[in-house]
Amino acid sequence: MWRQSTILAALLVALLCAGSAESKGNRPPRITKQPAPGELLFKVAQQNKESDNPFIIECEADGQPEPEYSWIKNGKKFDWQAYDNRMLRQPGRGTLVITIPKDEDRGHYQCFASNEFGTATSNSVYVRKAELNAFKDEAAKTLEAVEGEPFMLKCAAPDGFPSPTVNWMIQESIDGSIKSINNSRMTLDPEGNLWFSNVTREDASSDFYYACSATSVFRSEYKIGNKVLLDVKQMGVSASQNKHPPVRQYVSRRQSLALRGKRMELFCIYGGTPLPQTVWSKDGQRIQWSDRITQGHYGKSLVIRQTNFDDAGTYTCDVSNGVGNAQSFSIILNVNSVPYFTKEPEIATAAEDEEVVFECRAAGVPEPKISWIHNGKPIEQSTPNPRRTVTDNTIRIINLVKGDTGNYGCNATNSLGYVYKDVYLNVQAEPPTISEAPAAVSTVDGRNVTIKCRVNGSPKPLVKWLRASNWLTGGRYNVQANGDLEIQDVTFSDAGKYTCYAQNKFGEIQADGSLVVKEHTRITQEPQNYEVAAGQSATFRCNEAHDDTLEIEIDWWKDGQSIDFEAQPRFVKTNDNSLTIAKTMELDSGEYTCVARTRLDEATARANLIVQDVPNAPKLTGITCQADKAEIHWEQQGDNRSPILHYTIQFNTSFTPASWDAAYEKVPNTDSSFVVQMSPWANYTFRVIAFNKIGASPPSAHSDSCTTQPDVPFKNPDNVVGQGTEPNNLVISWTPMPEIEHNAPNFHYYVSWKRDIPAAAWENNNIFDWRQNNIVIADQPTFVKYLIKVVAINDRGESNVAAEEVVGYSGEDRPLDAPTNFTMRQITSSTSGYMAWTPVSEESVRGHFKGYKIQTWTENEGEEGLREIHVKGDTHNALVTQFKPDSKNYARILAYNGRFNGPPSAVIDFDTPEGVPSPVQGLDAYPLGSSAFMLHWKKPLYPNGKLTGYKIYYEEVKESYVGERREYDPHITDPRVTRMKMAGLKPNSKYRISITATTKMGEGSEHYIEKTTLKDAVNVAPATPSFSWEQLPSDNGLAKFRINWLPSTEGHPGTHFFTMHRIKGETQWIRENEEKNSDYQEVGGLDPETAYEFRVVSVDGHFNTESATQEIDTNTVEGPIMVANETVANAGWFIGMMLALAFIIILFIIICIIRRNRGGKYDVHDRELANGRRDYPEEGGFHEYSQPLDNKSAGRQSVSSANKPGVESDTDSMAEYGDGDTGQFTEDGSFIGQYVPGKLQPPVSPQPLNNSAAAHQAAPTAGGSGAAGSAAAAGASGGASSAGGAAASNGGAAAGAVATYV
């Protein structure tokens, strides 16, 4: 028993499963393809003239089981199989194919698709035959119109369906060719009539017809008829007098109707002369034109595309042409509509015992009526259902059962048409199933992402999403109707596991998915808009940032299309993903997009490129030739993205066929015609060139030729001049007139001249070579006045303007006299003085008296360096300002004319006082720490006296102003000093530092620089310094040294320093005071014959850094000994030099006596003549053996100067000062160079002073080797120490130098 029960239960379960399997997917039919509501046209082939044109009536549906199809025609069942083979149905579809259309196929068709669950209904379509009849066969008519008046051509168009499109055209009477009419005076109304706003003589049709055409777009055919010949009756008055006020020709109905969504055109056609202008307004407001509302027929109609209810209103056209009263006409436009859904019914799937509502709402004008269809029949005819409630807009069914499954249709109808939709109700019982489970989804932050979860079931399952035991509802989470989860504005915290949960009353199911969130891609450097001239390169840069785990690809697009870099080699994507376009052209203009793309997202940035090129060549449209002018007409052909600025009209003539000249430049860019004057007796052609900011366009094609008639010349030669080239001639010159100015054949010049004295007769000469530009008249007196004129003559006569008489002169000769009594009246400054002279007579000048030239030079410059000052000829004194200060100046004066200088006066000389110096030659400032500079400069190029020192000023430079100017103290009173430390400045501040050199006359011009101090090195100690040392003369038996601070060349140098020393072996250091104003320190009071240890310490703020220790022995001679200043008279070097000189002279005398006693002769002067004169330098050589000079006192003047230190010495200022090492303190900046960034030099070890080395080495070259050898011998025996040797050498060199000036 139990076994039988088990088997029965198993069978029941199997049957239930089978039933469920069978029901799964069953549904009523649904129409998927159907005819559009309205009409469907077909074409019937005419007898043997054309082939058949099959057409189809579509009907397709889906459903389970597959639906079966049936048709009704004109409300009755339609058996398409009864039509032989002319009709067939597509397999598996309901679509009818009519292969051979016939007239009886016309009618209303409707398709039904049925299965066991319901019947779906398609739209009803009216199938109608398209046809076009022919025009009546009539001969061409001749009609007469009056010039200037409105006129109409009426078209009797043939019948057809749909109504044919009517047009008027022009048909040539000879070959029958057809041209369309596109004319602002001719307008076609909707009824096919052609309206002339006014008739002109050109409208007369002597060799053509006006013809009316009717076109059927569906049939692709047109027909022509109503041919008209138009005769225009001329009024015999000018066009400016033939005027007519506006007159109404055709207007739309005052009450016009438009359909929503359709095109509507309102007409307002008026005639009149001149052509009337039309202004449209709506409800009193002028219409703003747009893409949807435009003007048609040159403003005579208003076109509305896709009309809507807001377009209803009163439209008014106001018409005027300046003649008579303005006219107006108003049209009231109403907008109706075929029905359209505002709420469509939707397919419903539900379970038993549930409730379903179908809702259908529609609008339209007139208001539509809604009716319901059930399984292909009006719902009133369907089986009654007490659970079903039907109203105008809804169907409600409660307590659903399986038998409620079926199709429901909503039909909204008014007098203009209908709208229909068929849906179904499917009653099922299925537990939830997941057809597409959630997957592992990746996205980037900031975007929206959707995790799919597609479920099936009946009733429709409720889908919810779960994450970490929390239901996801609201906020950024949105569960869509199909079950998918949308997360908006994803963040990194959204990454993780997500669960999709589906449930209905028959069961539940769930599935898991996951979300990975990565960093979004972004553009960090966007390309910038670029404007470039054609031919240049353009570069767009694009940088991005993206998630490191994703691969990135950079692409470039132009105008929405990817750039093919292989096909376009001018486009290059570089390694940094920039886009470079080489040799740009106008067509490269457009929008360029940088696309940074990963597999998850992309970022874009756009920039526009405008490539501007020269304009296209203008197009000449015509030329009008008149007697003496031509009017050129042209059209511009594009500005290539840079507006046209102006035009240039060029011409050439038969005289210069290979060249083009400008007839007029800068023709305004708004002009398209221009009138150009022409010369007589020439053939002209013209062309036009357009200009924009890029340049000139190619020229237009040249115009036809314009020819002008001969005439007299319109001018005489220009630039007539009479001026002699020799003292005894007169040259008359002029500018030749080009052939374009000849104006007729046999052109020549008629040259006339005469003396400008009473009763003088004109002399004449004809010049027949038009290229000749002068005539020479010989044998004339020197510099006399003439009257001259040159006349242009041709076959037609003399020029029509009188020739101007020009004054000329024969040739000039050299002035005879020099100014006398040339004196310096008063010296007013170091560079200026008043000079006076006795003038020369004008007769002695023998030419145009231009004035005087004062020539001045100095003793050092010589006459080769003279300067000239020009003075007017009507004065006899002048203030001259070009003298050299503190110098012997020379001057002379002469008169001059247009060609020659006269003889000069006697030369005078005078001494000028000292002046102020020129600026120093250079100034540099090198930072020392954060609050000091080391300044270095070079002496002025022109001291203009004896330098007395320098003054230094400084001022702080702010962003918008300069601070107070201050003099740095102490100022420098020794002219030999060319460097100084400037301390006490602010860190990281900009200063303007100025320096002036001084003489006893005051300060010279300043030289300034601007430099910034270093930033304050907070918590940074100076780098390790070093130092050098020099031994100074002892003080009361105690040793003394000078310690030179050498700051670090590698790091922070420090701002100042101090010195430390101790006796070697002791532990206590003795510290000197901090030295803040100099870079050296003198340390005295040291025990003799003692070894000391020295250090220097660099200081900056609270930080000190010590140098390495150096040992110095107070009895050493390794360091240079610096000698205090002493006078020449008691200087040891001077005494030694005098002794050495005396020894050399005695030795030389002995040698000469010995040679003479031997009979030998040593004529130095003759030997020098044989070898040629040599130019020896002033500082070397034995000039007493040279050829005697005229100025015998020159050498003696230098003897006294040898006792004074020279200002412009070859040694540097510190060496002259006597307290520095020439090896380390030269003016070329070898010491200061240590502070130049990047060019810092290592410390230089002390070297002995050797100021006489150059002179000592030069002595053999300047004089005899014997003298030099003696000097060397004296130096060698002067002492055992190197210091003594140096002194002896100094003496020898000094002796040689003195010998130069003896």
Swiss-Prot record:
Forms a complex with Nrx-IV/Nrx and Cont. Forms a complex composed of septate junction proteins Nrx-IV/Nrx, Tsf2/MTf, Cont and Nrg during late embryogenesis. Essential for septate junctions. Septate junctions, which are the equivalent of vertebrate tight junctions, are characterized by regular arrays of transverse structures that span the intermembrane space and form a physical barrier to diffusion. Required for formation of the hemolymph-brain barrier (the insect blood-brain barrier). Vital for embryonic development. Involved in the targeting for degradation or recycling of certain septate junction components, including kune and bou/boudin, by regulating their endocytosis. Residues 1172-1182 have a biased composition (Basic and acidic residues). This is Neuroglian. The keyword Magnesium does not apply. The lineage of its organism: Eukaryota, Metazoa, Ecdysozoa, Arthropoda, Hexapoda. It is a single-pass type I membrane protein. Residues 614-711, 716-813, 818-915, 916-1017, 1021-1119 form the Fibronectin type-III domain. It holds the Pfam family Ig_3. SUPFAM superfamilies: Fibronectin type III, Immunoglobulin. It is found in: Cell membrane; Cell junction, Septate junction.
